[in-house]
Amino acid sequence: MLKFISWNVNGLRACYDKGFVDVFHRLEADFFCLQETKMQEGQLDAKFEGYHSYWNYAEKKGYSGTAIFSKVKPLSVTYGLGIEEHDHEGRVITLELESFYLITVYTPNSQEELRRLDYRMKWEDDFRAYLKKLEEKKPVIVCGDLNVAHKEIDLKNPKTNRKNAGFTDEERAKFTTLLESGFTDTFRYFYPEQEGIYSWWSYRFKAREKNAGWRIDYFLTSDSLRNKLKGAHIHTDIFGSDHCPVELTIEL
Protein backbone atom coordinates (compact mmCIF):
# COMPACT_ATOMS: atom_id res chain seq x y z
CA MET A 1 0.00 0.00 0.00
CA LEU A 2 1.32 3.43 -0.94
CA LYS A 3 0.20 6.71 0.58
CA PHE A 4 0.38 9.95 -1.40
CA ILE A 5 -0.16 13.48 -0.07
CA SER A 6 -0.51 16.66 -2.12
CA TRP A 7 -0.59 20.12 -0.55
CA ASN A 8 -0.56 23.63 -1.93
CA VAL A 9 1.39 25.25 0.91
CA ASN A 10 1.01 28.85 -0.33
CA GLY A 11 4.65 29.59 0.47
CA LEU A 12 6.66 26.83 2.14
CA ARG A 13 8.64 29.19 4.37
CA ALA A 14 5.40 30.63 5.76
CA CYS A 15 3.94 27.14 6.12
CA TYR A 16 7.06 26.06 8.04
CA ASP A 17 6.19 28.68 10.63
CA LYS A 18 2.67 27.24 10.85
CA GLY A 19 3.57 23.64 11.63
CA PHE A 20 4.53 22.11 8.28
CA VAL A 21 7.16 19.77 9.76
CA ASP A 22 4.70 18.32 12.28
CA VAL A 23 2.13 17.72 9.54
CA PHE A 24 4.75 16.11 7.32
CA HIS A 25 5.78 13.63 10.00
CA ARG A 26 2.22 12.98 11.17
CA LEU A 27 0.92 12.08 7.72
CA GLU A 28 3.79 9.65 7.03
CA ALA A 29 3.35 9.62 3.26
CA ASP A 30 5.44 7.59 0.85
CA PHE A 31 5.21 10.53 -1.55
CA PHE A 32 4.58 14.10 -0.34
CA CYS A 33 3.96 16.60 -3.15
CA LEU A 34 3.91 20.39 -2.76
CA GLN A 35 2.67 23.23 -4.91
CA GLU A 36 3.19 26.97 -4.62
CA THR A 37 6.43 26.62 -2.68
CA LYS A 38 7.21 30.28 -3.53
CA MET A 39 10.93 30.00 -2.95
CA GLN A 40 14.32 29.80 -4.62
CA GLU A 41 17.04 27.22 -4.15
CA GLY A 42 18.86 27.56 -0.84
CA GLN A 43 16.18 29.61 0.93
CA LEU A 44 15.10 26.73 3.18
CA ASP A 45 16.88 23.60 4.33
CA ALA A 46 13.87 21.31 3.86
CA LYS A 47 15.35 17.84 4.16
CA PHE A 48 13.62 14.88 5.75
CA GLU A 49 15.41 11.70 6.74
CA GLY A 50 14.42 8.78 4.55
CA TYR A 51 13.16 10.99 1.71
CA HIS A 52 14.65 12.03 -1.60
CA SER A 53 13.62 15.57 -2.52
CA TYR A 54 13.05 17.16 -5.92
CA TRP A 55 12.37 20.85 -6.55
CA ASN A 56 11.21 22.87 -9.52
CA TYR A 57 11.59 26.60 -8.88
CA ALA A 58 9.97 29.42 -10.80
CA GLU A 59 12.35 31.92 -12.36
CA LYS A 60 10.30 34.72 -10.79
CA LYS A 61 11.10 35.03 -7.08
CA GLY A 62 8.42 34.24 -4.50
CA TYR A 63 6.12 32.69 -7.09
CA SER A 64 4.70 29.27 -7.99
CA GLY A 65 7.09 26.30 -7.65
CA THR A 66 6.65 22.60 -6.88
CA ALA A 67 8.42 19.89 -4.89
CA ILE A 68 8.19 16.16 -4.24
CA PHE A 69 9.55 14.22 -1.25
CA SER A 70 9.78 10.52 -2.07
CA LYS A 71 10.73 7.54 0.07
CA VAL A 72 11.49 5.66 -3.15
CA LYS A 73 14.37 6.74 -5.37
CA PRO A 74 12.80 7.22 -8.82
CA LEU A 75 14.22 5.79 -12.04
CA SER A 76 14.19 9.29 -13.52
CA VAL A 77 13.02 12.84 -12.77
CA THR A 78 11.74 15.37 -15.29
CA TYR A 79 11.11 19.06 -14.63
CA GLY A 80 8.49 20.87 -16.68
CA LEU A 81 6.69 19.74 -19.83
CA GLY A 82 9.56 20.21 -22.24
CA ILE A 83 7.67 23.11 -23.83
CA GLU A 84 9.45 26.46 -23.66
CA GLU A 85 6.44 28.69 -22.99
CA HIS A 86 5.28 26.53 -20.06
CA ASP A 87 8.56 25.83 -18.32
CA HIS A 88 9.57 29.10 -16.60
CA GLU A 89 7.25 28.90 -13.59
CA GLY A 90 8.29 25.64 -11.90
CA ARG A 91 4.87 24.07 -12.29
CA VAL A 92 5.51 20.39 -13.01
CA ILE A 93 7.68 17.57 -11.66
CA THR A 94 7.49 14.01 -12.98
CA LEU A 95 8.95 11.00 -11.19
CA GLU A 96 9.23 7.75 -13.09
CA LEU A 97 8.82 4.80 -10.73
CA GLU A 98 8.97 1.08 -11.47
CA SER A 99 5.28 0.63 -12.26
CA PHE A 100 3.88 4.17 -12.65
CA TYR A 101 4.60 7.84 -13.20
CA LEU A 102 3.90 10.42 -10.48
CA ILE A 103 3.33 13.98 -11.63
CA THR A 104 2.72 16.95 -9.39
CA VAL A 105 1.36 20.11 -10.99
CA TYR A 106 0.44 23.65 -10.09
CA THR A 107 -1.94 24.60 -12.89
CA PRO A 108 -1.82 28.27 -13.98
CA ASN A 109 -4.62 30.37 -12.53
CA SER A 110 -6.73 32.17 -15.15
CA GLN A 111 -6.56 35.26 -12.90
CA GLU A 112 -8.81 38.26 -12.39
CA GLU A 113 -10.82 39.31 -15.43
CA LEU A 114 -9.67 35.97 -16.91
CA ARG A 115 -6.64 37.69 -18.37
CA ARG A 116 -4.72 34.42 -18.50
CA LEU A 117 -7.58 32.21 -19.70
CA ASP A 118 -6.26 31.88 -23.25
CA TYR A 119 -2.89 30.76 -21.93
CA ARG A 120 -4.64 28.39 -19.51
CA MET A 121 -6.50 26.74 -22.41
CA LYS A 122 -3.21 26.08 -24.20
CA TRP A 123 -1.67 24.77 -21.00
CA GLU A 124 -4.59 22.36 -20.50
CA ASP A 125 -4.20 20.86 -23.97
CA ASP A 126 -0.42 20.56 -23.70
CA PHE A 127 -0.53 19.10 -20.18
CA ARG A 128 -3.15 16.52 -21.20
CA ALA A 129 -1.03 15.52 -24.21
CA TYR A 130 2.00 15.20 -21.91
CA LEU A 131 0.11 12.86 -19.56
CA LYS A 132 -1.24 10.74 -22.40
CA LYS A 133 2.26 10.37 -23.85
CA LEU A 134 3.57 9.12 -20.50
CA GLU A 135 0.62 6.78 -20.21
CA GLU A 136 1.70 4.95 -23.35
CA LYS A 137 4.53 3.56 -21.22
CA LYS A 138 3.07 3.26 -17.70
CA PRO A 139 -0.03 4.26 -15.71
CA VAL A 140 -0.06 7.82 -14.38
CA ILE A 141 -0.86 9.36 -10.99
CA VAL A 142 -1.20 13.13 -11.17
CA CYS A 143 -1.78 15.38 -8.18
CA GLY A 144 -1.83 19.03 -7.33
CA ASP A 145 -3.70 22.29 -7.42
CA LEU A 146 -5.54 22.06 -10.75
CA ASN A 147 -7.20 25.45 -10.19
CA VAL A 148 -10.66 24.27 -11.23
CA ALA A 149 -13.77 23.20 -9.36
CA HIS A 150 -15.21 20.62 -11.74
CA LYS A 151 -18.90 20.51 -10.84
CA GLU A 152 -21.30 22.66 -8.82
CA ILE A 153 -20.91 20.18 -5.97
CA ASP A 154 -17.22 21.16 -5.81
CA LEU A 155 -17.68 24.69 -4.46
CA LYS A 156 -19.93 26.40 -1.96
CA ASN A 157 -21.22 29.20 -4.21
CA PRO A 158 -21.44 27.97 -7.82
CA LYS A 159 -24.01 30.51 -9.00
CA THR A 160 -21.97 33.59 -8.11
CA ASN A 161 -18.72 32.14 -9.47
CA ARG A 162 -19.77 31.11 -12.98
CA LYS A 163 -17.59 33.74 -14.62
CA ASN A 164 -14.72 33.62 -12.13
CA ALA A 165 -11.31 31.98 -12.60
CA GLY A 166 -11.51 28.35 -11.54
CA PHE A 167 -15.18 27.84 -12.38
CA THR A 168 -15.57 29.09 -15.94
CA ASP A 169 -17.30 26.86 -18.46
CA GLU A 170 -14.04 26.71 -20.41
CA GLU A 171 -11.94 25.45 -17.50
CA ARG A 172 -14.56 22.95 -16.40
CA ALA A 173 -14.87 21.62 -19.95
CA LYS A 174 -11.11 21.08 -20.15
CA PHE A 175 -11.25 19.11 -16.91
CA THR A 176 -14.07 16.98 -18.30
CA THR A 177 -11.99 16.37 -21.43
CA LEU A 178 -9.06 15.27 -19.25
CA LEU A 179 -11.21 12.78 -17.34
CA GLU A 180 -12.81 11.50 -20.53
CA SER A 181 -9.35 10.89 -21.99
CA GLY A 182 -8.92 8.15 -19.38
CA PHE A 183 -8.43 9.59 -15.89
CA THR A 184 -10.29 9.09 -12.62
CA ASP A 185 -11.00 11.82 -10.05
CA THR A 186 -10.16 9.64 -7.06
CA PHE A 187 -12.12 11.61 -4.45
CA ARG A 188 -15.29 11.41 -6.53
CA TYR A 189 -14.61 7.73 -7.24
CA PHE A 190 -15.11 7.07 -3.52
CA TYR A 191 -17.54 9.91 -2.71
CA PRO A 192 -19.57 10.71 -5.85
CA GLU A 193 -22.28 12.70 -4.04
CA GLN A 194 -20.37 14.13 -1.06
CA GLU A 195 -21.08 17.84 -0.59
CA GLY A 196 -19.34 20.44 1.54
CA ILE A 197 -15.83 18.96 1.30
CA TYR A 198 -13.35 21.51 -0.05
CA SER A 199 -9.59 21.93 -0.27
CA TRP A 200 -9.22 25.71 -0.62
CA TRP A 201 -10.80 28.69 1.13
CA SER A 202 -10.14 32.36 0.49
CA TYR A 203 -8.34 34.17 3.30
CA ARG A 204 -11.04 36.83 3.02
CA PHE A 205 -14.59 36.92 4.44
CA LYS A 206 -13.88 34.25 7.09
CA ALA A 207 -14.34 31.75 4.28
CA ARG A 208 -12.79 28.79 6.06
CA GLU A 209 -14.78 29.43 9.22
CA LYS A 210 -17.95 29.38 7.10
CA ASN A 211 -16.66 26.51 4.94
CA ALA A 212 -17.19 28.65 1.84
CA GLY A 213 -14.61 26.70 -0.12
CA TRP A 214 -13.65 25.10 -3.41
CA ARG A 215 -12.33 21.61 -4.18
CA ILE A 216 -9.50 22.41 -6.58
CA ASP A 217 -6.80 20.02 -5.33
CA TYR A 218 -6.93 16.54 -6.80
CA PHE A 219 -5.46 13.12 -7.25
CA LEU A 220 -6.22 11.78 -10.70
CA THR A 221 -5.13 8.33 -11.84
CA SER A 222 -5.16 6.47 -15.10
CA ASP A 223 -8.43 4.54 -15.35
CA SER A 224 -6.39 1.33 -15.47
CA LEU A 225 -5.51 1.85 -11.77
CA ARG A 226 -9.12 2.06 -10.58
CA ASN A 227 -9.20 -1.45 -9.16
CA LYS A 228 -6.09 -0.63 -7.11
CA LEU A 229 -7.49 2.50 -5.42
CA LYS A 230 -7.92 2.04 -1.67
CA GLY A 231 -8.91 5.44 -0.32
CA ALA A 232 -9.11 9.20 -0.86
CA HIS A 233 -9.21 11.84 1.85
CA ILE A 234 -9.23 15.62 2.15
CA HIS A 235 -7.63 16.80 5.40
CA THR A 236 -9.91 19.74 6.12
CA ASP A 237 -8.70 19.79 9.74
CA ILE A 238 -5.10 20.63 8.79
CA PHE A 239 -4.17 24.31 8.73
CA GLY A 240 -1.00 26.15 7.67
CA SER A 241 -2.14 27.31 4.22
CA ASP A 242 -5.29 28.50 2.48
CA HIS A 243 -5.39 24.96 1.04
CA CYS A 244 -5.46 21.71 3.00
CA PRO A 245 -3.65 18.48 2.09
CA VAL A 246 -5.36 15.84 -0.03
CA GLU A 247 -4.54 12.14 0.14
CA LEU A 248 -4.64 9.00 -1.97
CA THR A 249 -3.92 5.44 -0.88
CA ILE A 250 -3.39 2.84 -3.57
CA GLU A 251 -2.22 -0.77 -3.78
CA LEU A 252 0.68 -0.87 -6.23
Regions found by a protein language model. Give the residues of each.
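Structured beta-strand-rich core segments of catalytic domains in phosphoester-bond hydrolases
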Residues: 38, 43-110
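Conserved beta strand-loop-helix elements of the APE1-like EEP
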Residues: 61-76, 197, 205-227
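Active-site beta-strand termini and strand-to-loop segments that position acidic
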Residues: 71, 95-98, 222-223, 241, ...
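Surface-exposed cleft-lining segments at the edges of enzyme active sites
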Residues: 82-83, 108-124, 159-164
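N-terminal, active-site-proximal structural segment of metallo-dependent hydrolase catalytic domains
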Residues: 1-48, 58-64
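Active-site beta-strand/loop signature of hydrolases that rely on acidic residues for catalysis
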Residues: 8, 24-42, 102, 131-152, ...
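Metal-dependent phosphoesterases centered on the DNase I-like endonuclease/exonuclease/phosphatase
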Residues: 52, 126-212, 216
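Active-site-proximal beta-strand elements of phosphoester/diester hydrolases
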Residues: 2-10, 99-111, 143
